[in-house]
Amino acid sequence: MPSLKDLKNRIGSVKNTRKITKAMQMVAAAKLRRAQEAAEAARPFAERMTAVMTGLAGSVGSSESAPRLLAGTGSDKVHLLVVMTAERGLCGGFNSSIVRLARAHAAKLLTQGKTVKILTVGKKGREQLRRDLGQHFIGHVDLSEVKRMGYPVAQGIARDLLDRFDKGEFDVATIFFARFQSVISQVPTAQQVIPAVFEGEGEVSSLYDYEPSEEGVLADLLPRGVATQIFTALLENGASEQGARMSAMDNATRNAGDMINRLTIEYNRSRQAAITKELIEIISGAEAL
């Protein structure tokens, strides 16, 4: 049975931990608001660009003049998986859920005889994936020095992907991230970015005149579209990370409070037992006299 001193030290230690988790929860809440605002501000542009490109892609179709980013290489042998996770932990199952989805996708491709290459964005994903898929790694993007996510970061990642695609290093690129829904709900998502995939009808291209041509405009927009998709994914990931961390720290704070209550009850019982024992000894001594 722990001594009163040990129990008192444990109570003090848990109280200090609760202060830390509460502070982290408040910081995550503030960062979450900023991340949500950034994600919401980027959506109209991304949706409009997607609508225009969808309409152009529908007009261009699978013609011989279709841009390579739309038509693809004609093969799907080599797949590049871009796995986006956080630089830090203490955010519940946020990182592991994205890694789990990427790992399952890689296993499926390998079973089909495909070649898999992995590019990680964020420290935590690299740490987890290197354990069993280290031989498939081709690069890593370090975001530890990025204080606030901006479009130039997405442009840099997109430029790297486009250069690798032009060099023939892969046929299909898919990004993995968590789509933000709420503080307690972040959905792991896989989204193909190269070659471009469009759903729906989008803007009707016949309503516009494109110069020099629809193919030329689409060829210019597609690289921007890749960067925009990556930027949107990074923003969604950022909001999801802060939401997950806020939820995890809230749970940790509550658990710390419950533990303090249990330890306090145990401390009081032990103290009461010690006092009772001393009283019994005093009374017994008095009776002996």
Swiss-Prot record:
Compartments, as annotated in UniProt: Cell inner membrane
Family annotation (Pfam families): ATP-synt (PF00231)
GO cellular component terms given for this protein: plasma membrane; proton-transporting ATP synthase complex
GO molecular function annotations of the record: ATP binding; proton-transporting ATP synthase activity, rotational mechanism
Swiss-Prot/TrEMBL keywords: ATP synthesis, Cell inner membrane, Cell membrane, CF(1), Hydrogen ion transport, Ion transport, Membrane, Transport
InterPro entries: ATP_synth_F1_ATPase_gsu (IPR035968), ATP_synth_F1_gsu (IPR000131), ATP_synth_F1_gsu_CS (IPR023632)
Family statement: Belongs to the ATPase gamma chain family.
Cited function: Produces ATP from ADP in the presence of a proton gradient across the membrane. The gamma chain is believed to be important in regulating ATPase activity and the flow of protons through the CF(0) complex.
Protein name as it appears in the record: ATP synthase gamma chain
Organism of origin: Cereibacter sphaeroides (strain ATCC 17029 / ATH 2.4.9)
Gene name per UniProt: atpG
